[in-house]
Amino acid sequence: MTRSLRVVATMALLHLSIGPSPARAVAPPPVDRAALPAASSPAPPGPTEQTGRCVGSAPARITRGEQLSSLNLPTVWPLSRGSGQLVAVIDTGVARHRLLPHLLPGGDFVSSGDGTQDCDGHGTAVAGLIGGAPTSEFSGVAPDVGIMAIRQSSNKFRLTSDLSPD
């Protein structure tokens, strides 16, 4: 072996025997508390008015569908059904419904509610797919998960200042 090859091999063995340097904890950056905005409850930026009728609640009788059959949920549920987890549905709100027993109010940026009103129906449908209670016809992916309802938009409400005069 040539001298340079022996030096390279020795250096490689030395490097491998020492190993990588340990990770170091990095302290979070300092926060200037004076620069933070004051805490406030969720609310729209101004007064709002309802401009359309709310959609009705979901039908009492759900027809069997194959929408989620490819997920094969019964094989996953022994591992987890979402218990102890919380999912925020930030949408058009989530209406209280018997198939959403773990619904929690989270806030309303559209009107003066708590997020558990849904005039558009979209947020409620999304929450049902995530955590709808199982029936013989349908179940959400994680039926034991908590759902926090946050209404951030609605086609049925407008800021009063945005309404054109009649």
Residue ranges and their predicted role:
Residues 1, 165-166:
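Short intrinsically disordered, low-complexity coil segments enriched in acidic
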Residues 11-85, 98-99:
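Protease zymogen maturation seam
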